[in-house]
Amino acid sequence: TLAAMRGVKAEGGWGVVNTEYCSIHPSSDDVPHPFASLWDEGDVRNMAAMADAVHEHGSLAGTELWYGGIRSSNHHSREVALAPSSFPAAESPWQCAKMDLDDIRTFRGWHRAAALRAKQADLDIVYVYAAHTYILNQFLDRDMNTRTDEYGGTLMQRARLLREVLSETRNAIGDRCGIALRIEVDNEDGGGFEERSELLAALAPMVDLFDVTIADYSQEMGGSRFIKEGSLEPSIAHVRKITGKPVVSVGRFTSPETMLSQVKSGIVDLIGAARPSIADPFLPLKIAEGREDDIRECIGCNICVTHDYTMTPLRCTQNPSMGEEWRRGWHPEMIRPKEEDKHILVVGAGPAGLEAARALGQRGYQVTIADKASEAGGRVARESRLPGLSAWGRVRDWRLLQLNKLPNVSLYLESEMTPETVAELGADHILVTTGSEWLRDLTGRHTLAPFHHPQGCDVLTPDDLMAGRRPKARDVVLFDDDHYYRG
C-alpha cells in the first residue's frame, strides 16, 4: 500500500519521496502506528518495493532512521526502550532504561546496520533523525540528558553520539546514498538558537542536506486556522548561510509563489511538503505544466494528522484516493471511463455531491447536480466563513473549477428536488448526497440517550450558529460530545 502511494507521488513529479520515521530496532516500535522499519531482511524487501516504485518515475527515495527512546511505547515488541536518562516511556506504565556505555555502543551498531539495510534496499537518501524528542535529540537536550560521562555536559559534549552516528552512517553507506540530518534549530524550551547554530556549523562537514525544523511541533504541524503557510521561515532563515549546505524545510506550503519565494530568497534549496503532497500528489507536475489552477491545495484541516495519531491508515479531505492506490487501484488524476451512456442525477452540491459529480463527469457520464441552496458547497461553504477557516473553501472551489471544465456536467442551484421532479427528469441513476446535521437532543459519543433540557432552554447546534442564529440568553453552556473540532 505504501509503496503504491509513494510511487504515485513520484509519478506526480516530487523529486524526493521519503518514508516517515523508520524504526531501526524492535526496542523502538510504535505499533499500532503504521510506521516503517528496517529490522531485518524482510524489511529490506518491503523497502526495496517502495524504492522501485519511486525510481520507476525518476525520483529519489529516502528513509528517516528512527529510534524513539522515551517516545517508544514498544507495545508490540515488549522490549525495554533505551534513553540517555531513565524516564517514563511514552503513554506506557513502564520506564526506559538509562543507557550505559555498552548500550550506546550497541545502539550505534543498530543504527549502522539499519543504514546498511537502507543501502541494500537501493535508497538514495538516508536520514539521521535528531529532532522531535527522539533519541538523538534527547541526548542533545539538557533537560533529558543529565549524564555526567562523556555523553553529557555542554551541547557539544551532548552531541557526541550524534557525531558518532553521522560518521558511522557515512562509513556504512559511502557515497552511494546522501546523508540528510533532520534537526531542530532551537532547544526543546524554545531557546538556544545561538548554541544550536554553532552545532549546525560544526556538523556541516558530515552532512549532505539539512532538514531543519523547530522544537514546537504545533508550529510545524498546526492546522490552517492557527498556523499560516511558511510559518517556520523566521526561525530557519539563517541555516543555509551558516552551514553552506543545502537546506530543506516544511511549512504546509500550498502556494507555488510562496515556494518559489522561499528558494529565491535563499531560505531553502528544496521545499519539504508532506501534507501538500497528500492533498495533491501531482502538485509539482502541475506547476511544471503551468496548471497551477488545477492544484488540489491542502486545506490544513489535519485529518491526515488525526489518522496518524489514531493509528489508522492515512486519509485526506481533499484527495479521496489517498491510501487507496494499491487496495482499490484509485489514482488521483485518472479514473476508469464509462462503459455505457447513462444520465446520472446528483442531489446535493456539498463536498460529497461535487466530488461525485466531478468523478462521474470525468468518466464521461451525463451528470446533473441540483441543490436547493443558493450557493454550492453545503456545510463547507458555511464553515469556511468562520474565523480562520477560509482555506477550507478550497474543497468547494477546486471542485467547482473542475466541473466548469466538463461540458457534460450541469449544476443547478436553488433547485429543490422532490419525488415528482426527480421522476420527471428521468435519470438512469440517482445519488442522494444531502449530508447530515447535528442533533438537538445532545446525543453524541458518550451521551447515548437523549437529554431532556429544561423547558424554555434555547438549544443551538453548530448548524444554527453557522446559519447566523445566536443565543438569546446571556449565559451560555458549551456542550461538546463530538470530541473533534467543533467545540
Cite the ranges covered by each PLM segment:
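Flavin-dependent oxidoreductase catalytic cores
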Residues: 1-347, 351, 355-367, 375, ...
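Beta1-alpha1 glycine-rich phosphate/pyrophosphate-binding loop at the start
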Residues: 210, 346-410, 481-487
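Glycine-rich, anion-gripping cofactor-binding loops and their flanking helix/strand elements
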Residues: 224-236, 241, 384-397, 405, ...
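Short acidic loop-to-helix transition motifs that present clustered carboxylates
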Residues: 254-257, 278, 416-419, 465-468
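Glycine-rich dinucleotide-binding loop and its adjacent helix/turn
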Residues: 324-333, 337, 402-405, 411, ...
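NAD(P)H/NAD(P)+-dependent Rossmann-fold oxidoreductase cores
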Residues: 389-390, 404, 420-421, 434-435
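A conserved short coil-to-beta-strand element within the FAD-binding core of flavoproteins
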Residues: 412-425
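Glycine-/small-residue-rich beta->alpha transition segments that form the dinucleotide
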Residues: 427-429, 433-443
